């Protein structure tokens, strides 16, 4: 009996083992099937996402009513917007994603503009600083509507932001109108966008625009002895670099820019992003702005402002603006301020704390919201700095 029982128990154990093995095999097969479904779904999501991005970033004619000014997204029957320097950037995943991001930023910026009532000023629009038909090689001139004949007003040259990839001078129109209405001649300039070109070509465009202003500024009620160059965000980087390039023939040769033959009285930098190589995680975005081959270019050693400032003879008095809600550039603005001070530049920084207006003011708030109390105050303080610089210059 004992043997039979043991024998029966042995058979039962074997059956259970077989059942367990069968169940395990089925479970393994089921898990494989489950993973296959998950992978299939992920691949489908990726394909749909890629298709969505491609459709969202299709180029539109520069004559279309719904054109969006984003690099690589404007086409023409007569103008070639891409010059080859940005070759390969259109396939860069960061650039493709940011094209889509900037597209949706465009809607928000237009809504902000529609809600604002800029002052009426005299405007001369779409002047070509390079006669090639490229809409990005144009600028506007704005000055007070009540300017008297023979008047000579201090000049301000503005370079818009937009992450080097987005926007045109219209983005800063209301801001420039606010500046002009306070008694200035304002030049609002365009420049080509990444990925049609790279940051280097943008600096070339800015230099050409500055040279045009130097040659033609006297045609407007403009005192060319007093000029403040200003820019916000990416435009702040272009402004800061341009101020140095004005003073260094060696750097102009490296960057292949013309000599603007211009002397600045002051520099105004709003949330400048001037450290593109050593900017932490943000550099994943900023480094490709110099091209897919940025490491092989002569400009590679000069992608951060602290790498070029020693080439400047004497930068003009510089005013910097940032805010507690400026998550993109608060640290960069403070870092730039420290570099300027360390090199003996007369510099002031205004970092708007949350307590001042009971809110965390966003990135470039004074440019995008120039008629809000905080924006108005920021502009007034910056212009007071410019006035002080003019007074000091006149006393020399």
Where are these regions (language model features)?
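Exposed, low-complexity/repetitive linear segments and helix-based recognition motifs
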Residues: 1, 9-12, 51, 229
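N-terminal Lys/Arg-rich, disordered targeting/topogenic segments
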Residues: 3-34
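Intrinsically disordered, low-complexity regions enriched in polar/acidic and amide residues
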Residues: 1, 18-20, 236, 395
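Alpha/beta-hydrolase superfamily serine-hydrolase fold, recognizing
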Residues: 34, 38-396
């Amino acid at each position: 009996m004992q043997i039979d029982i043991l024998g029966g128990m042995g058979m039962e154990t074997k059956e259970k083992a077989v059942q367990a093995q069968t169940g395990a095999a089925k479970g393994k097969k089921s898990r494989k099937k489950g993973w296959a479904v998950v992978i299939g779904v992920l691949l489908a999501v990726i394909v749909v996402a890629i298709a969505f991005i491609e459709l969202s970033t299709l180029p539109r004619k520069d004559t279309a009513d719904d054109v969006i000014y984003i690099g690589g997204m404007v086409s023409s029957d007569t103008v070639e917007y891409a010059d080859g320097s940005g070759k390969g950037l259109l396939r860069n995943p960061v650039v493709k994603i940011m094209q889509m991001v900037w597209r949706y930023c465009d809607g928000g910026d237009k809504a902000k503009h529609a809600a604002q009532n800029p002052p009426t000023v005299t405007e001369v629009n779409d002047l070509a600083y390079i006669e090639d038909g490229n809409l990005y090689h144009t600028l506007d001139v704005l000055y007070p509507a009540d300017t008297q004949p023979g008047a000579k007003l201090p000049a301000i040259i503005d370079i818009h932001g937009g992450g080097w990839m987005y926007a045109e001078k219209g983005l800063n129109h209301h801001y420039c109108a606010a500046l002009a209405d306070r008694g200035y001649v304002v030049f609002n300039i365009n420049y080509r966008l990444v990925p049609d070109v790279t940051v280097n070509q943008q600096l070339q465009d800015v230099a050409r625009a500055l040279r045009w202003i130097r040659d033609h500024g006297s045609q407007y009620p403009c005192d060319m002895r007093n000029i403040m160059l200003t820019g916000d965000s990416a435009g702040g980087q272009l402004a800061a670099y341009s101020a140095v390039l004005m003073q260094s023939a060696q750097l102009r040769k490296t960057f292949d820019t013309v000599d603007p033959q211009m002397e600045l009285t002051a520099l105004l930098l709003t949330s400048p992003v001037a450290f593109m190589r050593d900017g932490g995680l943000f550099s994943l975005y900023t480094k490709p702005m110099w091209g897919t081959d940025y490491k092989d270019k002569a400009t590679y050693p000069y992608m951060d402002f602290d790498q070029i400032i020693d080439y400047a003879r004497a930068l003009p008095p510089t005013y910097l603006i940032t805010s507690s809600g400026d998550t993109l550039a608060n640290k960069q603005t403070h870092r730039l301020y420290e570099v300027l001070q360390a090199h003996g530049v007369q510099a002031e920084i205004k970092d708007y704390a949350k307590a001042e207006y009971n809110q965390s003011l966003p990135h470039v708030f004074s440019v995008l919201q120039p008629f809000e109390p905080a924006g108005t105050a920021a502009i007034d303080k910056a212009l007071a700095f410019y006035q002080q610089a003019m007074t000091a210059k006149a006393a020399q």
